[in-house]
Amino acid sequence: MSDSLNAAALDQLFRTARTQNAFADTPVSQEVLRELYELVKWGSTAANSGPARFVFVTSADGKAKLKPALSEGNAAKTLAAPVTVIVAHDEDFHEKLPYLFPHADAKSWFDGPREGRAESAFRNGSLQGAYLILAARALGLDAGPMSGFDNAKVDAAFFAGTPIKSNFLVNLGYGDPAGLFPRSPRLSFDEAARFE
């Protein structure tokens, strides 16, 4: 690994980054979203499985399809956001492992009933969703992740007849500070971690 990032980069990724509730009326281009994925795909996952699947909802039709699944408290901000990413995972991710992990027969590790690999798909897809948030911040975007929606409705609307399941949503764009709440505290090291 190379040198540590400078303080400004760490601030942008972590210390001064906020969960955004409102965004400027500025579109996010498909080129930027493709660049975002090109960063996300390099994040580590078990056996290089990369089970996450992303739907970048940007059109009026896409937002209309998403709207019935949103909780009342998340609907307005999600419909107004330039981009809403459905972070999902493919429970048949193992079918791609001969390509993604060619130096071992990793596909055989996950053969069998889908339920047996769903946990790995969820865990590693969640990792990739976190990478997406950090990659977005690295590209100058703001993010508003949330789980206040009906997964079954999203799955029916966007993934019907597939082994893909939604996990959480992330609104993306250029944040409007007027929509921020005061910064909430975080647990100290001693409250959240220990040495053994």
Curated annotation (Swiss-Prot):
One Pfam match: Nitroreductase
GO MF annotation terms: oxidoreductase activity
Disulfides per UniProt: none
EC number(s) recorded for this UniProt protein: 1.-.-.-
Listed cofactors: FMN
Transmembrane segments: none
Keyword NAD: yes
Keyword entries, A-Z: Flavoprotein, FMN, NAD, NADP, Oxidoreductase
Family of the protein in this entry: Belongs to the nitroreductase family. HadB/RutE subfamily.
PANTHER family on file: MALONIC SEMIALDEHYDE REDUCTASE RUTE-RELATED (PTHR43543:SF1)
Protein name: Putative NADH dehydrogenase/NAD(P)H nitroreductase PXO_03909
Organism annotation: Xanthomonas oryzae pv. oryzae (strain PXO99A)
Lineage: Bacteria, Pseudomonadati, Pseudomonadota, Gammaproteobacteria, Lysobacterales
